[in-house]
């Protein structure tokens, strides 16, 4: 009887098992369908453009597909507002919005791979808003959208003396050419905020803002006054400082007491006022001459400090060269769009994109980069990379264990210590946020020094021997040199990136010798190259 009860319980469980089995089959089918889905990728974050400059709108398909026969449309706010329309064999301008005519530049270098770019020239404040791009064919339609923010930094503020007002002197600060509406502040010599007497901000036909604001400075209150104007979208501000001697500030109380007397002796009062005015203008002239002299002294001091820092950076670069290492590139890690030379020193972009063997754990599938064969887990190592005249690149070092099957943020938190160039002149690092780098001389060759035990990775401009930037971190694994030539370089035949051959030296300390050419900043040997360097 007990066996019969067990058999009945087994029969009750059969429908439940079948339900789980069919649910599992349906999940596998849905996963297989979604795995082949293609979508459109645009900028991941809002784009900030400056007034009068150009801005780039990149757009691509999530997988390599030929988009040459597709309709590609950039639009504003809605699809019907056409910014640019690509339709084989060439873009059509009849549907283009009037404000964008003769201001767009279409790049189709990688259209066979599903990647295109649109440049909008001479950005205006009215260009601010939401944009998008759409790919359209007989069997596919997809789009991506993003925000464009526009910012304009106006002219340097100017403070003018408007005259005496009540119990003090009235100053006026003016500036123009700002977007969006700027913020303005008056501050005293101790940094305290001063309440403005008046403030007027106007907007011209081009959408740019001009401002005029005034403040009254009273006797004994401030030895100097500054006018500060800041753009809310840019991390910079413009400031003008004027110094006022207390003797020039009117004191109304004694004047009020003497008012009756001046009415009686009006001619004498006029003489006294004339003498005071002459004294005021004489003091003002002396003050201006003193300000000019002080400005020249400050400039000389800053130039001396700059020269000292430059010589200090060159000494650090010279010391780094004694740790020169023979670094070569590993073709097994290179992205399929890159080609590594036979000697392992040069990497360049190739036209065709070969297929990648499935499950290859060494090769990068998304990042167009390549790693070195050498692995560094101790000691100091120095190498140099010739970047030529490329307008975009990244280089540095990364952990050997970084993920290679998808995109990555090139910051120390993800295992990357690199610097980069964007749009020919924007040098920066991610530490962890974007940090802009100011370089006096555009580098054609970058030196990299890795001090593993000290947790330090430094970059040098070999063109003038100056120090650029240093990461300080704690390394937790083997590091490899990292090179990433950007595919969208902006030139038809961009220069390759090359790891330079350096004389490998022992650990001995180099002596200072200004006549040792090997230690001097890098100078090109090709006369034609040298001429181009001078022109640039």
UniProtKB/Swiss-Prot annotation:
Its main location: membrane. Glycans are attached at residues 102, 139, 224. Residues 279-536 are cytoplasmic. Disulfide bonds join 59-133, 173-227. Coiled coil: none annotated. Residues 1-35 form the signal peptide. It is found in: Membrane. Keywords: Disulfide bond, Glycoprotein, Immunoglobulin domain, Membrane, Repeat, Signal, Transmembrane, Transmembrane helix. Residues 307-506 form the B30.2/SPRY domain. Pfam families: C2-set_3 (PF22705), PRY (PF13765), SPRY (PF00622), V-set (PF07686). The keyword Repeat applies. The chain crosses the membrane at residues 258-278. One of its GO terms (cellular component) is membrane. SUPFAM superfamilies: Concanavalin A-like lectins/glucanases, Immunoglobulin. Residues 36-257 are extracellular. Residues 36-149, 152-241 form the Ig-like V-type domain. It is a single-pass type I membrane protein. InterPro entries: B30.2/SPRY, B30.2/SPRY_sf, BTN3A2-like_Ig-C, Butyrophylin_SPRY, ConA-like_dom_sf, Ig-like_dom, Ig-like_dom_sf, Ig-like_fold. PROSITE patterns: B302_SPRY, IG_LIKE. Belongs to the immunoglobulin superfamily. BTN/MOG family. This is Butyrophilin-like protein 9. It comes from Mus musculus. The lineage of its organism: Eukaryota, Metazoa, Chordata, Craniata, Vertebrata. The gene is Btnl9.
């Amino acid at each position: 009887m007990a066996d019969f009860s067990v058999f009945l319980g087994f029969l009750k469980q059969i429908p439940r098992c079948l339900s789980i089995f069919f649910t599992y089959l349906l999940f596998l089918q849905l996963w297989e369908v979604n795995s082949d889905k293609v979508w459109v990728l645009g900028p991941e974050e809002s784009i900030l453009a400056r007034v009068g400059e150009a801005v780039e709108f990149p757009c691509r398909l999530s997988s390599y597909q030929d988009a040459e026969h597709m309709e590609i449309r950039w639009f504003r706010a809605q699809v019907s507002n056409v910014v640019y329309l690509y339709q084989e064999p060439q873009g059509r301008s009849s549907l283009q919005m009037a404000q964008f005519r003769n201001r767009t530049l279409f790049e189709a270098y990688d259209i066979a791979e599903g990647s295109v770019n649109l440049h909008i020239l001479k950005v205006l404040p009215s260009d601010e808003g939401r944009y998008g791009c759409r790919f359209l064919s007989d069997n596919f339609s997809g789009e991506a959208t993003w925000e464009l923010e526009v910012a304009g930094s106006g002219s340097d503020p100017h403070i003018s003396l408007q005259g005496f007002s009540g119990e003090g002197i009235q100053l006026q600060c003016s500036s123009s050419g700002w977007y969006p509406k700027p913020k303005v502040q008056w501050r005293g010599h101790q940094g305290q905020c001063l309440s403005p007497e008046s403030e007027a901000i106007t907007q011209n036909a081009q959408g740019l803002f001009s401002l005029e604001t005034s403040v009254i400075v009273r006797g004994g209150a401030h030895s100097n006054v500054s006018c500060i104007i800041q753009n809310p979208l840019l991390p910079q501000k413009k400031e003008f400082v004027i110094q006022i001697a207390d003797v020039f500030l009117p004191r109304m109380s004694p004047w009020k007491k003497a008012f009756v007397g001046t009415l009686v002796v009006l001619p004498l009062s006029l003489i006294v006022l004339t003498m005071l005015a002459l004294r005021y203008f004489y003091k003002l002239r002396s003050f201006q001459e003193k300000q000019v002299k002080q400005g020249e002294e400050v400039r000389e001091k800053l130039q001396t400090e700059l020269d000292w820092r430059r010589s200090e950076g060159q000494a650090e670069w010279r010391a780094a060269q004694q740790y020169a290492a023979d670094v070569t590139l590993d073709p097994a890690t290179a992205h399929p769009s890159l080609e590594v030379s036979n000697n392992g020193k040069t990497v360049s972009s190739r036209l065709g994109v070969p297929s990648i063997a499935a499950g290859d754990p060494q090769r990068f599938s998304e990042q167009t980069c390549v790693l070195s064969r050498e692995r560094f887990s101790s000691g100091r190592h120095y190498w140099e990379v010739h970047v030529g005249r490329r307008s975009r690149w990244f280089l540095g070092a990364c952990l050997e264990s970084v993920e290679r099957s998808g995109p990555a943020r090139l910051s120390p938190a993800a295992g990357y210590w690199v610097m980069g160039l964007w749009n020919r002149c924007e040098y920066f690092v991610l530490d962890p946020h974007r940090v802009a780098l100011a370089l006096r001389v555009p580098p054609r060759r970058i030196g990299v020094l890795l001090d593993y035990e000290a947790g330090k990775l430094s970059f040098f401009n070999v063109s003038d021997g100056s120090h650029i930037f240093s990461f300080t971190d704690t390394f937790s694994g083997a590091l490899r040199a990292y090179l990433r030539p950007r595919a969208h370089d902006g030139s038809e035949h961009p220069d390759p990136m090359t790891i330079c051959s350096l004389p490998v030296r022992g650990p001995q300390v180099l002596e200072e010798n200004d006549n040792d050419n090997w230690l001097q900043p890098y100078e090109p040997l090709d006369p034609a190259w040298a001429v181009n360097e001078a022109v640039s």
